[in-house]
């Protein structure tokens, strides 16, 4: 079951021009809204175009709830990275020029309360991949809140780079692995949602030949690990000339459910 109080920014990609009446009602109700940042100015304020010649501004101090310095301001690169991206915000005020003053920080504060009070280990959340590092993936799960997905939690089959499975902007479901509420740190896992060993193994039968991907070549252990699915790996005898990432055909020699093992032969 997906548990979500806040959609990730940009989960729903759409734009509908907004009227002043609509924005004023949203301001009164404290509604969380979404728009695309059209510009980051020289003071690192973010500008939103609502259509109908109506604009809004997210002042720099209202951009972030977490990633700020000792003065309460986010770093310039954080502000600049929001250009042409969907962001969530609340309408705080309207100035004498009819420009709406917005706050992304207020949404972030609400999302932090959700994380601290309601989000639990094992819950499934929607997320969007925001950045990829060699060690893992940063995923936004709602209201600007970001969790870390370590590379070893992406799949059972070992991979050398997260980009072999996920890409920036990809939308998917993730499971909460752990929460450090004191430091606002969330660890996610993806492999638990790719099926158990039994669920994956039932799609294969002894005596059949299928395609696999080489994931580990360990000559010392006299074996090559072959990915049949992201969450199902079999072991084949070592063979010269086989390299990581290579597509190979494998004969399924034996499936051993009680040991959760699959014996393969590279053909």
Model-inferred region functions:
Residues 1-267:
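Single-stranded RNA-binding regions, centering on S1/OB-family and related RNA-binding modules
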